[in-house]
Regions:
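Conserved phosphate- and dinucleotide-binding cores of soluble alpha/beta proteins
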Residues: 1-141
Length: 142
């Protein structure tokens, strides 16, 4: 695996999770299956299918800053990036920004209580978590 080349440290999985739980992560970049207006994120149960969170919980809940990255929608979206900006030829069939997520894998309320800084980045816009919910802070040029 390419990521194992020139490693600064190779540690057992158990020790890695202890590092996560101990607050060793300053910033993490994670994918998002869907997010809602409150800032909650779901990666564990999508379209009625149980996927499971894996190590997502330990990483997302214990990092000081969390940056969620994902597309605005899924399945069939056609987007071009040109010198003039973003061109959306076709939106996807499955929205990923929803009123309420199917299951809460990342709790925005817990993040607020913990003092985490949280950003949500899509190809169309950037949002941040505030006390009032999710705030739009940047729109991609188009």
């Amino acid at each position: 695996f390419g990521c194992a080349r020139n490693a600064d440290a190779i540690i057992p999985s158990l020790d890695q999770f202890e590092f996560y739980s101990g607050g060793g992560i300053d910033i993490t970049f994670l994918g998002m299956g869907e997010m809602d207006q409150y800032g909650n994120v779901n990666v564990s149960h999508l379209n009625g299918n149980l996927i499971g969170p894996g190590g997502f919980l330990e990483i997302a809940q214990n990092a000081r800053k969390v940056v969620f990255c994902g597309t605005f929608d899924a399945k069939g979206s056609k987007i071009d990036v040109t010198p003039d900006g973003l061109h959306i030829a076709q939106s996807g069939q499955i929205p990923k920004l929803v009123t309420q997520v199917e299951k809460i894998t990342f709790s925005a309320a817990y993040a607020q209580q913990s003092g985490q800084e949280v950003l949500y980045i899509t190809e169309r816009a950037v949002f941040q978590l505030t006390a009032e919910g999710v705030e739009l802070i940047e729109i991609a040029p188009s």
